[in-house]
């Protein structure tokens, strides 16, 4: 899927946007680190009867700008969100954010209050001020070890389908990632669009975002978490965030993990629609 449009972020980075279908109030999807906007089409398919669903690629991802000299701080990610919402120019925008995408939506709302009428965030990476950020260090190290090039898209699909985390997601999401998250090279091989070094920088920059930066927000915000698992786990960040937010509500899902929206899009879509309806006081 090629971009539906492009918009310029504050520093000149080009941000690619995707119209995923539907009409009505806008639902903006903000993807997780290392992924891309277009691969969330299967989630959008459960929402297009209620919303005009739009996704985009953060800088360093998909078809957006991704050179090594770009600033990948999460404040810059929030500026990418702002560029997209300004481009959309819609009266009402609801946000869905996954992991880093959720944190970026929160920062964008902090910077410009009332950007979003409501938000549904799955395991946004926002640390309590007194909690160790070691998990992001581990993720950065792991990202740098990722293989960047493969013989073909079929090779990627075969390899990723047999190992975590992509062996846990619906096949359509993995296919969307392989189609949209890799670029063909002159020799016929394919290469990650979000290169390992850039992904690592983004993970490491996530340590900058703390709860005190966003806890004052009054927007109706659902914070959703999957099951608690051994080791550094973003699910543990959700309850303190939901408790601290003025308009926060916590959703728990014991049957899915950090890639939950890609594992059970129907349940996530159902609860998102219910959350938006309660936030707006309507039956959409």
How would you label these PLM feature ranges?
Residues 10, 58-96, 270:
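Active-site loop/oxyanion-hole signature of alpha/beta-hydrolase fold enzymes
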Residues 16-66:
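Conserved HGGG/HGGXW glycine-rich cap/lid loop of the alpha/beta-hydrolase fold
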Residues 30-32, 98, 225:
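The conserved beta1-alpha1 loop
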Residues 97, 101, 105:
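Gly/Ala-rich beta-loop-alpha elbow adjacent to hydrolase catalytic centers
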Residues 110, 117-149:
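Flexible "cap/lid" loop of the alpha/beta hydrolase fold
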Residues 149-205:
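Conserved alpha/beta-hydrolase catalytic His-Asp/Glu region
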Residues 183-243:
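Conserved serine/cysteine hydrolase catalytic core
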Residues 253-266:
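Catalytic histidine-centered segment of alpha/beta-hydrolase-like enzymes
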């Amino acid at each position: 899927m090629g971009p539906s449009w492009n918009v310029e972020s504050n520093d000149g980075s080009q941000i690619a946007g995707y119209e995923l279908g539907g009409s009505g109030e806008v639902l903006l999807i903000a993807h997780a680190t290392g992924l891309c906007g277009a691969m969330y089409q299967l989630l959008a398919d459960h929402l297009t009867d209620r919303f005009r669903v739009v996704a985009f690629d953060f800088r360093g991802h998909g078809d957006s700008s991704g050179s090594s000299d770009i600033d990948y701080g999460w404040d810059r990610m929030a500026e990418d969100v702002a560029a997209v919402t300004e481009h959309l120019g819609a009266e009402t925008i609801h946000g869905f954010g996954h992991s880093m995408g959720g944190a970026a939506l929160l920062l964008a709302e902090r910077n410009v209050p009332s950007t979003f009428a409501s938000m549904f965030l799955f395991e946004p990476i926002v640390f309590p001020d007194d909690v160790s950020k070691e998990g992001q260090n581990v993720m950065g190290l792991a990202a740098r070890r990722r293989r960047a090039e493969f013989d073909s898209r079929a090779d990627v699909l075969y390899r990723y389908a047999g190992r975590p985390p992509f062996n846990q997601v619906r096949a359509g999401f993995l296919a969307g990632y392989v189609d949209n998250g890799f670029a063909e090279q002159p020799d016929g091989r394919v290469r990650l669009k979000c290169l390992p070094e850039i992904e690592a920088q983004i993970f490491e920059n996530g340590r900058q975002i703390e709860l005190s930066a966003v806890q004052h927000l009054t927007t109706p915000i659902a914070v959703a978490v999957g099951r608690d698992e051994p080791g550094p786990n973003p699910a543990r960040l959700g309850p303190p965030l939901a408790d601290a937010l003025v308009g926060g509500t916590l959703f728990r899902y014991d049957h899915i993990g950090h890639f939950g929206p890609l594992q059970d899009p129907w349940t996530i879509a159902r609860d998102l629609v219910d959350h938006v309806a309660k936030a707006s006081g309507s039956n959409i």
